[in-house]
Amino acid sequence: MRLIDQNSALQRYLFRGNTPVESKKFAWDKLRSVLAQTAKQEYNITLPSQYYVVDVSLLNFTEEDLTIEEKFFKENPQLGHLVHWTIVGMLINGTDLPDWLRKEAALYEKKWDFEDRLLERVPQLHDWLWEANSTQSFESHGYVKGTPLVFYIHCEAGMDRTGEVSGSYYLKYLKWTYMKTLAYDYHVENNPRPIEYLSQNALNWFCWHLYYTEGYPLDCAQSLPRK
């Protein structure tokens, strides 16, 4: 588990990790324990004793853990709310294309971002964290306005789809380089490995989109081993 970003003034925290489901049950107590431990030991942050969890699940509809998450929050709306975003990645890496074709595709997001919707979802994560009134929609799901919020992004292993979405956040809002982002994604767990190529490809497209639209220098053409 890792902290991505935080807003101490609003008491909102954005974490990434693996599935919170163990032995076909939502491991609520363990999730809270690991969140508190990670925040304190790794970032010297003391989480509030009470908070509302927004579980941003990147699992596919066919994955059993998603059904377990849905059931848990349906039965416990006072604890949190499930947000489900399907993430599939991209077959083609933008760096492998000629510059003219890559630029044309990167600027027309429907050619690369039609499924994962990173250009919409990554700013949504940032707004939830930093815009005070951005969380009003949660109030119809059991959220009490003013309660501290923990946003928890995850897939199954917490590396591939999670690395794609989290990595896009690092690039856009933390201004990390592409190489720093990849290296971090590769080493987020105890056994380092490249993130799955479909997710890495989508992250690369997001990098190129920022390069062509926002003007700040990015090293999108560089890469670590993809496999």
Which residue ranges define each predicted feature?
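Cys-dependent protein tyrosine phosphatase-like superfamily
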Residues: 1-152, 156-157, 164-227
